[in-house]
């Protein structure tokens, strides 16, 4: 299903994130995939970035449309951002992707 989102979904990006979005009919809640490549840093740094992304998505969950599958890909520049910067950058790219209500 990840591959289907990559191949047929629409993409949006900013300096720190790429988001692929695929609408899914009759889905009660959104589903998300998070990808953080090795260029971001070692395993500890990558897990830290994933935690920050998950926390940001958790805060934004009420504003995200429920009938979507989407994948968030972190670019290497994300490793230097604080949690608040990750939140604002992620919110920006999700608005570009028209994921927000």
PLM-predicted stretches and their roles:
Residues 1-101:
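Positively charged, solvent-exposed patches that mediate nucleic-acid binding
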């Amino acid at each position: 299903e990840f591959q289907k989102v990559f191949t047929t979904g629409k993409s949006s990006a900013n300096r720190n994130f790429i988001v692929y979005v695929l609408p899914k009919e009759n889905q009660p809640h959104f589903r998300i995939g998070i990808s953080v490549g090795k260029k971001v840093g070692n395993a500890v740094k990558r897990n830290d970035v994933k935690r920050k992304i998950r926390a940001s998505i958790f805060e934004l969950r009420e504003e995200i449309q429920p009938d979507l599958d989407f994948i968030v890909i972190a670019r290497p520049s994300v490793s230097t951002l604080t949690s608040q910067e990750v939140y604002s950058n992620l919110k920006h790219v999700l608005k570009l992707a028209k994921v927000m209500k």
